[in-house]
């Protein structure tokens, strides 16, 4: 594994369901050749700060949570003027999380 990925998730989004799938998610990315750095948000702006901190240290950022988590990651990456790919696994309760 020579690729690195930051996985940021909101443990409270979607009634905490993401936690039951966490090992499966990490396993999928490991099989894809990624070393996964996992960060569970604890307070507002955590995802934003982690995205800014890691955008130059990883090859991919994936987040899971509601629209707020996604917004924080995208904003953090955009402020750094980075072109790093961002993935999103919806886990929130809002309707915008259920559309494609």
How would you name each of these model-derived features?
Residues 3-100:
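Small-residue-rich beta-alpha loop regions that form the catalytic core of phosphotransfer
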